[in-house]
């Protein structure tokens, strides 16, 4: 907009948009996005007047996290990592970018979302899209044939983000995978048990875990009349059933993917089926599906899986759902996805960036997904040697969003530090004594703070504890120094007791353990 009057009118209109959003108490992300647009318009106007206005904002699809949000994230990570470790997993790390050829051809229709980097001297590079393909590359490169690993790191997708719906271009994934040649369905059952434990401990609300098998899907497509070359693309369309009505999915199959209406209707008859071990038994008797060796192998494994899930006592949360497809190309066997049926509290909008999960219309949304990918490592091995793998990815951004909303609704204050005690003084000229005592506490492993003023008022020191949630104050005064004691104050109850200086460390540890 070169015309100054037009630019001023656009600024006025955009200002009204921002004010309206604020009055409607819209989400912070939505307001920030519109404010950024307003600032960009103002920057253009400033440029017309010979000034350069630098717009301070994060890149599209990214965000900053304040101390309160990070405290919540740390709590969530700790719960998840403890579950991973309880199951005997060890952790690895890998580069944030890979050779482009490492990632190409592994994600089906989602490959267009891979972030390519500008050529920096010969190697074509891309930012990692998930943690699974780099893990497979790591196994092949290091000739590892069995490992149980977890990996928590950021991944990148060149999505067109609508941050009001919690979609980002940079987000965390939390992956757990078991690699190795083992007896059928035992590692797969453990992955489902792990998901059950994590979601139960996070207390996000009611959930269910949907399971299916790629072999059953492929067998189903074959007997329904889907051409072999269209299996993967139809799989991606079926994967949208958690977000779209059947009519919309059918329309895509017929109009965009070229299936006949008759074939689409046959698919519908199967994808509407749900159950448990009983459904697996029924499908083995299905006159058409039982003709597919591939489907029968998947159904037989599904029966075995449910027998192990019964031993783990989690079948009340697991449903065999033939509509579950998961669009990623590398799955070869069992696939699963955990969805929240009722969040606690139900979020208005929640992030969905995890291994293939997106906003779901029929439930609060997917919070975990995964499956078996026995052929992926072989794609990287020069001799094509396969390492069977099964794993799960926790949709951590969605979890963070729900936990943040729970914190907003809770009366309990979120602490952003772990300070156990503040070293304070009741009189002036005691800075040296405060610093000496603080050093003693630090040396003993106590988390302690001291205010950076020579002569702070006692009231302001106590107020700092109230504001930040520090539970104890160690108060020094001239009399306390003479008597060799420290006055230890409980901030919540305001009770004070004189503690001999030599016993202070033990007393603080006892009270804060």
Curated annotation (Swiss-Prot):
Q: Which SUPFAM superfamilies match?
A: Class II aaRS ABD-related, Class II aaRS and biotin synthetases, S15/NS1 RNA-binding domain
An example of a Pfam family matching this protein is: HGTP_anticodon
Keyword terms: Aminoacyl-tRNA synthetase, ATP-binding, Cytoplasm, Ligase, Mitochondrion, Nucleotide-binding, Protein biosynthesis
Q: Where does L-histidine bind?
A: 130-132, 157, 173, 177, 326, 330-331
Which cystines does this chain contain? none
Annotated WHEP-TRS domain residues: 3-59
Q: Isomerase among the record's keywords?
A: no
Entry's EC annotation:
6.1.1.21
Q: Which reaction does it catalyse?
A: tRNA(His) + L-histidine + ATP = L-histidyl-tRNA(His) + AMP + diphosphate + H(+)
Which GO MF terms does the UniProt record name? ATP binding; histidine-tRNA ligase activity; identical protein binding; RNA binding
For this chain's UniProt record, which GO biological process terms are given?
A: histidyl-tRNA aminoacylation; mitochondrial translation; regulation of vasculature development; sprouting angiogenesis
Which InterPro entries does its entry note? aa-tRNA-synth_II (IPR006195), aa-tRNA-synth_II/BPL/LPL (IPR045864), Anticodon-bd (IPR004154), Anticodon-bd_dom_sf (IPR036621), His-tRNA-ligase (IPR015807), HisRS-like_core (IPR041715), HisRS/HisZ (IPR004516), HisRS_anticodon (IPR033656)
Q: Name one GO cellular component term.
A: cytoplasm
Which top-rank group of organisms is this from?
Eukaryota
What family, per the record?
Answer: Belongs to the class-II aminoacyl-tRNA synthetase family.
Job description of the protein: Catalyzes the aminoacylation of histidyl-tRNA.
Q: Which HAMAP family does UniProt cross-reference here? A: His_tRNA_synth
Q: Any remaining note in the record?
A: Danio rerio genome encodes a single hars gene which undergoes alternative splicing to produce both a cytoplasmic and mitochondrial enzyme, while humans have two separate genes.
PANTHER family for this protein: HISTIDINE--TRNA LIGASE, HISTIDYL-TRNA SYNTHETASE
- Listed name of the protein: Histidine--tRNA ligase
- Whose protein is this, by species? Danio rerio
Tell me the classification of the organism that encodes this protein.
Eukaryota, Metazoa, Chordata, Craniata, Vertebrata
Query: Which gene name does the record give?
Result: hars
